[in-house]
Amino acid sequence: VKLSKYGQFAGLALAGSLALSACGSDQAVDPKHAADARNVDCVDGGGTLSGAGSSAQENAVAAWTAAYEGACGDTTINYDAVGSGAGRSQFIDGAVTFAGSDAALDKKETEQATERCKGSEVVNLPAYISPIAVAFNLDGIDSLNLKPEVIGDIFNQKITKWNDEKIAADNPDVELPDTKIVPVNRSDESGTTENFTAYLAEAAGDAWPHEADGNWPIKPAEAAQGSSGVVSAIQGGQGTIGYVDASHVGGLGTASVGVGDGFVAYSPEAAAAIVDASPEREGNTENDHAIELDYLTKESSAYPIVLVSYEIACMEYEDKKNAELVKSFLSYVVSEAGQQASSDETGSAPISSETRDKLQATIDKIGASA
């Protein structure tokens, strides 16, 4: 799906509202974000910036694009929401200038990306933080309490009916139907899958005997491509359950997840709580900011199934214009205005001021090798 020219802010006085299309769904973008984006340091002469990757970021990128293009009218941002794995591959192949990914580059990918960046450092910038919702479709039921091991058993296809005693034990006031559970997973390589399976591998114990992986590790009951595809599959069946970036949930039922002795519903604030409490990845350089999430937290305000999505870029580009465009656009993305635009449109958690300062310090160093 290509997100291009989502907004033409010919004049804010005339633009009472902006509707933008992302993956076939209309999104209303508050014109105030265009005004906020006017503080962006636009690139002289404009140009076209191409990115690809995370479908979880899709709606956020749409909001960023609309506001940024409104402020920098001679610049076009093209973002293809092909999924995190494909986005990383396109970046490594040099097909796009930046990538969006729900997982940071691993060691092998970093080596490949460094070669693509002609020997310059490649960095992971956590710019989009969102809960991963465990979403389901059961008539008359909007919310359920699910412990990590129960979620693991459901997606490992060991718990097969909604009125199973393990589900019923934590939902005594809910009349659970004798309906077959149909887990829905991503069919494509996905950072959302990698984050979700990383959580299960850490928190679900023996109920999830698989390692974290961007590819679903077992034979699926049902699978769909992209975040929108998973939501459509859940909506299309009764008894279905899946995992998806919270911005895509819509009217589906969602789970409150077991944390410590209680259950925590997803929210931007609850997602931010676990991110702020988690360290950066061991071995990061000064400019790299990949995060190691603490999935075993017992913090009662923290929602533990979180997607931290990154913008991946070279620290040096051969083409000066590309360097300027990446620097300008990513500066808006991590800015307070950009983060608020994303939060307003998707329910994502704005990054903290401390994180913003670190990311901006790295972005400020992006330049051209010639």
Regions found by a protein language model. Name each.
Residues 1-10:
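Bacterial N-terminal signal peptides that target proteins for export
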Residues 88, 189-281:
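Ligand-binding pocket segment of bilobal, Venus flytrap-like solute-binding proteins
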Residues 262-324:
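C-terminal lobe and pocket-closing loops
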Residues 29-168, 231-233, 244-250:
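N-terminal segment of the mature folded domain
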Residues 25-27, 32, 40-44, 174-179, ...:
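Extracellular/periplasmic juxtamembrane helices and adjacent flexible linkers that interface
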Residues 131-135, 141-231:
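Extracytoplasmic ligand-binding site segments that recognize negatively charged/polar headgroups
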Residues 62-74, 92-96, 104, 136-139, ...:
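Sec-exported extracytoplasmic/periplasmic mature domains
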Residues 17-22:
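C-terminal motif of bacterial Sec signal peptides marking the signal peptidase cleavage site
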